[in-house]
From Swiss-Prot:
Listed pathway(s): Aminoacyl-tRNA biosynthesis; selenocysteinyl-tRNA(Sec) biosynthesis; L-seryl-tRNA(Sec) from L-serine and tRNA(Sec): step 1/1
Species name: Halalkalibacterium halodurans (strain ATCC BAA-125 / DSM 18197 / FERM 7344 / JCM 9153 / C-125)
Function: Catalyzes the attachment of serine to tRNA(Ser). Is also able to aminoacylate tRNA(Sec) with serine, to form the misacylated tRNA L-seryl-tRNA(Sec), which will be further converted into selenocysteinyl-tRNA(Sec).
Keywords per UniProt: Aminoacyl-tRNA synthetase, ATP-binding, Cytoplasm, Ligase, Nucleotide-binding, Protein biosynthesis
Family according to the record: Belongs to the class-II aminoacyl-tRNA synthetase family. Type-1 seryl-tRNA synthetase subfamily.
Enzyme Commission code(s) on record: 6.1.1.11
Gene: serS
The protein's name: Serine--tRNA ligase
Cell compartments where the protein resides: Cytoplasm
GO cellular component, one term: cytoplasm
GO biological process: selenocysteine biosynthetic process; seryl-tRNA aminoacylation
GO molecular function, one term: serine-tRNA ligase activity
PROSITE patterns per UniProt: AA_TRNA_LIGASE_II
Binding site for ATP: 262-264, 349-352
Amino acid sequence: MLDIKRLRKDFAGIREKLQTRGEDISGLEKFGSLDEKRRQVIVKVEELKSRRNQVSQEVAQLKREKKDADHLIKEMRDVSDEIKGLDETLRQLDEELDQLLLAIPNVPHESTPVGETEDDNVEVRKWGEVPNFPFEPKAHWDLATALGIVDFERAAKVTGSRFAFYKGAGARLERALINFMMDLHHDKHGYEEVLPPYLVNRTSMTGTGQLPKFEEDAFKIREEDYFLIPTAEVPVTNLHRDEILSADQLPIAYTAYSMNFRSEAGSAGRDTRGLIRQHQFNKVELVRFVAPEDSYDELEKLTGHAEKVLQLLKLPYRVMSMCTADLGFTAAKKYDLEVWIPSANTYREISSCSNFEDFQARRANIKFRREAKGKAEFVHTLNGSGLAVGRTVAAILENYQQEDGTIVIPEVLRPYMGGMEKFEA
């Protein structure tokens, strides 16, 4: 949620920045007109209150002079009734403005590239060498099926499309990756491990920005106002909702493993095969609560933590700075890590690392005090995938495939796999 004071002070400037997102900003325009109406109502209320006070003094004077004041008393009552009606109008306007604020996206940071499509995203750096196979590389779903480690056909029978049934060494690989990532972020990067609920309430989904705009993308529990989480970002960020932290607590860093559930409503026809785009998938999340002046340094740090996973797995990747049109609703700045997928001959997203500044903190009311009796300020929140596990499985299968159909297991994972060195049929 944007700072309403900032919006009122620099409406034209914010509108100009939001227009670079290429989104419908009619809600912002409506906010401007409603806010002006609200200002006019406030002026009218103040005028009426001033008149009521004046009439009250005149009534008192007439009574002291033992003169008739009935006409003024009636006027005072009429004015009070009008004020009461305008107060109700103000209440309704404030509710409408609050709802409009919830639907306005975050303002892009000045360092975010301006662009109209994903083609305008900017490559920041690359790491690792793209493999040069002496054979035609196979897609991960074909490799996994041939090895019997992921069963897509039976998953479709049990549930439907965009689900996977991990089996045997495949299930063990998924678990090994989760443990490896969690150990790395806890032991080496200093994150506190948390295990969140997979169901959250409407207030939590609103706090992190999934609601109200993206409700159709969420899985909702029938007859309960609960939602299956689309990412651990939701429960973990809301861990400190409606709290005032102390400055010495910051930065707070959490890492969480969770299952994630997404309807992929806008992805019809995209990535219908394999592990890239699933309705249910595992992910290790990184969430940080920081002081505002530190948040962009913290974004670089968090992004580096996600990169370290790929480096230790020796998977080639690149870091992209997402342009204004590809930024997402809540972020002021976002990096995507894209891992090399040989069968597609391209890089694919495996992590997004975002700085939301105070956008989520305002929605979730998360503050901190620099001094014990100081004014409470909103924290800045950041999050990133560290990493999406299914996509990491896909990248390992494709980048470590051998001509005979076997898959070499990355060395860093072998202790988690009981010393296993390769997958073979």
